[in-house]
Design a protein with these regions (language model features):
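A short helix->beta-strand "capping" segment at the edge of beta-propeller domains
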Residues: 21-37, 78-83, 131, 410-414
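WD40/WD-repeat beta-propeller blade N-cap
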Residues: 33-36, 87-93, 138-144, 182-189, ...
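Terminal intrinsically disordered, low-complexity extensions flanking WD-repeat/beta-propeller proteins
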Residues: 35, 680-682, 690, 702-752
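Loop/turn segments within WD40 beta-propeller blades
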Residues: 43-47, 98-102, 148-153, 193-199, ...
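Hydrophobic beta-strand positions that form the internal "hydrophobic ladder"
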Residues: 51, 105, 156, 201-202, ...
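Conserved strand-to-loop turn within each blade of WD40 beta-propeller repeats
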Residues: 55, 108-114, 159-163, 205-207, ...
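WD40 beta-propeller blade core
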Residues: 60-61, 119, 166-168, 211, ...
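Short loop/turn segments that connect beta-strands within beta-propeller blades
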Residues: 65, 123-126, 172-175, 216-218, ...
Length: 752
């Protein structure tokens, strides 16, 4: 690294633009969470082994996770290393669908201006685990809200958003638009679905409008007929069409299900669920003999399609699945087993024993001393996967016909297979010397994750749930979690047991930054009022205030400590950064800028400090005299919200901006080397692993992404090469080179 004096002489206050066009894509290694706001965005692959879902501008094709035995902790999230990430969109994905046999995936996006592409991906014949882009359909502007494949995989229907307001039918194999038509006036369209027995007829529905579209291949014309709903005015959010194309089920925002008889295009029945659910019907999926309804309140409702009352639908049960709305429901296409009949215990081998078992089973069910799921017919049992708006993935079992009662039902319990943070993440942190796990904080929740598998190992929820965790960090023992809250308290927890160790009440108006001093002896914290305070910790159970320092006039956004803990740096919204003498409890130097400083980091060499803020400038400072070493401007018109410097070499600088992308800079060159794909929501925190091989990003939707650091990967490869050469030449000495943990090296993910 160049010295501070050399850097000042060469680049002092000389703004320069980084070369964004030459940057490569930052390789995504793994991710937790998905874009739950995309309607019907979660899909099961027809092979029954994989799932397909959107994550920002990326499509993830990953193995199905296995259920956990704990409500809050997932055991086996699936083999994340074998997940495939499909990149190609310039904006956030807003619609996703998969064809019946899994050959094609179609995805669409939202862009701020210009053409919103629809991309068709085809399964790679040579590598079945991945897809490749085969068609890019570019006719819609700004936004695409819904997509649907025909049953034979030959046709694709797409619906544009409010600024586009067009319905277009495509030929999947040639990529040409067969025909397009404006959306009928009277409301926006939210959903589309093809009829099962036709590749030229589909249904669209939305705000006060339901239309049946037909494509005339002879005249090359797309025409529509409005379905007669009588006097009903409903905002329709979801569509499901039965196997015989007789009925279309339309889920509404008013918790009603409209049943349309398709041959005559008339409303047959209106089935209300207002007594059981709230916030509308967000998703509908057909299952054998039943209709599954996902509601905005997070509940799953089972309706029988074999009603005995003469009606088309009959209410069976309603189960709470998630804390947020169910936007996707996917049902396994095959039952859990092809062996029909009641599953008997191993001891029931004779007909008498089986009849006796059935008799006592029915008696237990009638007296409520047993649950229906204790008696199973696996040939009638299907797995139902529910995706929520907050990115949770849950599984529940559906029985199409119970072997004793003959009714359809939902089995207990609900298995939470995978979950994002659950609330918007405000902070992410690694232990000082251990990259095996990390912690996130946001809302009333704190989670500790395993880095390799991205599985949640522990969860802490603070009451009341209206509280918000604003900052989080590990103390130097790597076991104690420090958290700052909007009620003005500092709370410390044991990482393993989640036990509350100590609380500093009234520490600040709102605790916005917190760090632990060496040896778990103290804590330094910053608040929304601008005070910096030092705390003494005794035996990890008592905390007392030692000093309070006031230099900032506004919120302190970040605190960074030097290695000896005798100096600290703070960044504030008042446009100043202050270097503090912790021993003397006094300011050493300060540097000012016309910005809100949002983030800072100290280079491992401790001769430079890097700051970023709302003025889009990245600034290198000398902590000795607060002089500017280098300033660069981000070329995009977006505020900088988070940064971190890789350790231990300090070769890479990660910057997160309000455009929802992370840019990786070479520290010495100040050039952008890699840039991430777009996140589904705003990025709130970035953190390098202690070994510098991974970069973690967290966002406001609760998702976490793990990126490989290419600079560190290539450095390890170079070190291995040098080691190999010295072995061959006989010059190898174990004391000459640092050891390289080859097994822990991050491998760049295979391109889609």
């Amino acid at each position: 690294m160049m010295s501070a004096r050399e850097a000042k002489n060469s680049t002092h206050q000389t703004p320069r633009l980084t070369n964004m066009s030459s940057s490569r894509e930052l390789p995504l290694e793994a991710a937790v969470g998905f874009s739950g706001s995309v309607a019907n965005g979660f899909h099961l692959h027809p092979d029954g082994k994989r799932r397909v879902y959107p994550l920002g501008d990326t499509i993830v094709v990953a193995p199905l996770p296995q259920p956990s035995r704990s409500k809050d902790v997932q055991e086996d999230p699936g083999d994340r290393a074998s997940a495939t990430f499909l990149h190609g969109h310039a904006g956030e994905i807003t619609a996703l669908t998969i064809s019946k046999y899994g050959r094609f995936i179609a995805s669409a996006e939202r862009v701020s201006s210009g053409i919103a592409d629809v991309i068709v991906w085809e399964e790679d014949v040579a590598v079945k685990s991945t897809y490749k882009e085969v068609r890019r359909l570019s006719l819609h502007t700004s936004h695409v809200v819904a997509l649907a494949f025909s049953e034979d995989e030959k046709s694709l229907a797409s619906v544009g958003g409010e600024t586009d307001e067009r319905v277009i039918m495509w030929d999947v194999h040639s990529g040409t638009a067969l025909c397009g038509s404006p959306i009928p006036s009277g409301g926006k369209v939210c959903a589309v679905a093809f009829l099962h027995r036709s590749n030229t007829t589909f249904i669209t529905a939305g705000e006060f409008v339901v239309s049946k579209w037909s494509y005339d291949d002879t005249n090359k014309r797309l025409s529509h007929d409005s379905l007669n709903l009588g006097t009903l005015k409903r905002h329709i959010l979801s569509i499901a069409i039965d196997e015989d194309d007789d009925y279309a089920y339309l889920g509404t925002s008013s918790a009603d299900i409209l049943i349309v008889f398709l041959p005559q295009s008339v409303l047959k029945e209106s089935f209300t669920l207002k007594r059981h659910i709230s916030q509308g019907v967000h998703s509908l999926t057909l299952a054998r003999n039943a209709l599954l309804v996902g509601a905005g309140d997070g509940s799953l409702t089972l309706l029988s399609r074999r009603a005995k009352s003469g009606k088309i639908l009959e209410f069976i049960c309603c189960r709470d699945i998630s804390r947020s709305g169910l936007t996707s429901i996917a049902v396994a296409r095959t039952a859990q087993s092809d062996v029909t009949g009641l599953v008997y215990p191993k001891g029931c081998k004779t007909q008498y024993a089986k009849r006796k078992f059935v008799h006592f089973a029915r008696l237990a069910l009638s007296q409520d001393t047993a649950q229906p799921e204790h008696y199973r017919d696996n040939s009638e049992t299907f797995d139902v996967y529910c995706g929520s708006e907050r990115g949770e993935l849950c599984k529940i079992e559906y029985c199409a016909r119970h072997p004793l009662s003959g009714q359809c039902m939902l089995h207990s319990p609900v298995n939470r297979l995978e979950t994002s943070h659950g609330y918007g993440i405000t902070g992410i942190t690694f232990p000082h010397d251990d990259g095996r796990y990390f912690a996130t904080g946001g809302g009333p929740e704190i989670r500790v994750w395993e880095t390799e598998t991205l599985s949640s190992r522990s969860r802490i929820v603070v009451t009341p749930r209206t509280l918000n965790c604003l900052c989080i960090s590990f103390m130097s023992d790597d076991e104690t979690l420090l958290t700052g809250w909007d009620d003005g308290k500092i709370r410390a927890y044991d990482r393993g047991s989640t036990r509350l160790l100590f609380v500093a009440a009234n520490a600040h108006e709102r605790v916005t930054a917190v760090q632990g001093l060496c040896g778990t002896s103290g804590v330094i914290s910053g608040g929304s009022e601008g005070n910096l305070r030092l705390w003494k910790v005794q035996n990890l159970n008592v905390i007392t205030l030692e000093a309070s320092m006031k230099e900032h006039r506004s919120k302190i956004n970040a605190i960074a400590l030097f290695n000896d803990d005798r100096s600290a740096v703070t960044a504030s919204d008042d446009g100043s950064c202050v270097v503090w003498d912790v021993d003397r409890r006094a300011r050493k130097v300060s540097f000012l800028g016309s910005t809100y400083f949002k983030a800072l980091s100290i280079h491992p060499g401790e001769r430079q400090i890097v700051t970023a803020g709302t003025d889009r400038k990245i600034t290198w400072w000398d902590p000795a005299d607060a002089s500017v070493i280098r300033v660069i401007d981000d070329t995009k018109d977006s505020e900088l919200v988070a940064l971190d410097i890789s350790r231990p070499d300090g070769a890479s600088l990660a910057i997160a901006a309000s455009d929802r992308r992370v840019r990786l800079y070479g520290y010495e060159s100040a050039e952008v080397t890699h840039m991430s794909s777009i996140h589904a929501s705003s990025i709130t925190a970035v953190a390098f692993a202690p070994d510098g091989r991974r970069l973690l990003t967290a966002s406001a939707d609760g998702s976490v992404r793990v990126w490989s650091n290419p600079a560190r990967v290539f450095a390890d490869l170079g070190l291995e090469k040098e080691l190999h050469i010295r072995r061959l030449t006989g010059e190898f000495d174990e004391t000459d080179l640092p050891s390289v943990d080859v097994g822990s090296r991050v491998h760049m993910s295979r391109p889609a």
